[in-house]
Amino acid sequence: MKKIIYTFFAFLLFAACTKENNTTKLEPVVSLTVNNLAADTIIGITPGVPPLGGMPYGAGKYTFYSIEKGAVVPSSDSATTKWDIAFRGTAILTNSGNGGPGAGGGFVYVGLFEDLKTVPSDSTFRTENVPTSYAIPFGSNKGWYVYDGLKNLVTPIPGRVLVIRTASGKIAKIEILNYYKGGVTPAATASDNVKMKDQRYYTFRYSYQPNGTKSF
């Protein structure tokens, strides 16, 4: 009888240990604010005067960023899955489709950043088909920003959240806060030289779900 009892308790102890070992420890949601991320900064002005000339131009290169690592990725790794999102001027690229070898994608969610607790079940993640289409629509008032030609300023649209699927298939939400150096939009009365010099520096915040779910 004692042998049976001992065997029973040994079984319970083994089962408890097995259950504990099989329990997956969930990682917390990562929240981060990124300041002054240079996105193909201005390197010159085209000859002439607007609209045919006098326009800023960059080197035409993307800045690659890993949402999962929280760090800029060297351009030499642009053909890998080490990056999740890339910036060039106002264009934003995901590691998907013909934009990269990853399982990424994205779409623009209309609503407040704080209110997006779970990605809606009917959401469609778009992938890159550059230059025909972008996962995050490119152009004034088409995606995350509006361009005021009279003031020559780019301003994030309130209530626009970028929902990003990373290169590994995880989910993040991003809010672009500012497009200018130091996170400060130049005054409308500032010179075009100042506006051009200080643009293409992103300030944004994001939350990243490392556990593979769609909830934050």
Regions found by a protein language model. Give the residues of each.
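C-terminal motif of bacterial Sec signal peptides marking the signal peptidase cleavage site
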Residues: 13-16
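Sec-dependent signal peptide recognition
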Residues: 2-7
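Surface-exposed, beta-sheet-biased, low-hydrophobicity segments with strongly acidic/polar composition
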Residues: 18-216
